[in-house]
């Protein structure tokens, strides 16, 4: 079924599930139509295949669509690389040819921590109270104002949601759609002031590899922004320092009836180890600049157990202390056992880009001006996560992060206001004008 037929069907649907669905009109903005189309293309990355780029072949499905659309919009060099990087260049407007080129970057992939295939977007006219995205097994999939107080400010808005069975994919297809809509505006009116623009859509951001293979020299930009944040107005130039710790526990299986003094249960070793890490430094107890240990997964038998943690902190010294505590916990257990049964492997992932971006305050100032020019109050926040901009900044391309307008990423309650999609495209237009 052609995408426009799917779009027409989705937007004409007026079934009620705890909220009023908006009927289609002939005035749907370009960015909305693009967004609804892009989220229906599955692009989940796969951490199990992190040794290859892209980690999932499905990311080419969107990459090829975007490359073709960019060519149709006049970016003659637009292409998708063998690793699913979509790159294109837009010439500067008249009078801005001598200005430094500016990059705009978003990522193709969606996370695998929630179902991401078969996304069925729809538009809910939100009237307050619980936001009900859909139903699963006869039960509403809802977000309450108690859990998300920001909903109180969105009454009367049209919100794009999934049907409650999958994530939506606003992270980061909202950013993709907003950049593409800006390119479409420039194609329609090349006199809109802008420097030469580099456009890039990267794969595998969700598994920490999004910027690794971007050829910065060929990209040719002095500065860049990722469009990968949350609610409208977010402006981020600090992120976590990040590492992954894989901890292995070797047990000794003995018949339980003969186990005294002989059995070493690897599953229990894991429990002992996990208890040595401060529980108040788990994600569910932290906010702002507070770092954490996050147990992402564990598998255990009596003979062997493996636990995978991610470790995060904005402060480099506190980050190192967290890594040192993991090593110390393993050493303590090994000393108690009199044998090296606990081993730790730590893999560095990314560093706090504030180390680089703080030397380019003009990038923050110009972004603030662009938000304010569009009637949006900028909110400068630390990223409680990572972004392609972290890797790029340390590779020589200073790269703060801008909002997309989305909420509740990485879950079935994810949504984005239609007005935020439009407004963020306006912000990007104002931003590039200030570099012209």
Language model features by range: what are they?
Residues 28-56, 161, 350, 410-411:
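N-terminal capping segment at the start of a domain
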Residues 48-49, 77, 191-196, 279-294, ...:
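Flexible, glycine/charged-enriched surface loops at secondary-structure junctions
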Residues 96-196, 201, 221:
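Active-site metal-coordination/substrate-binding segment of hydrolases
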Residues 268-285, 292-294, 341, 351-399:
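Active-site-adjacent substrate-binding region
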Residues 50-99, 103-105, 109, 120:
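A non-catalytic alpha/beta surface segment that caps or lines the substrate-entry region
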Residues 301-303, 377-430, 435:
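Zn-dependent metallopeptidase/amidohydrolase metal-coordination segment
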Residues 148-151, 157-170, 204-327, 331, ...:
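Midchain, well-structured core segments that form catalytic/ion-binding scaffolds
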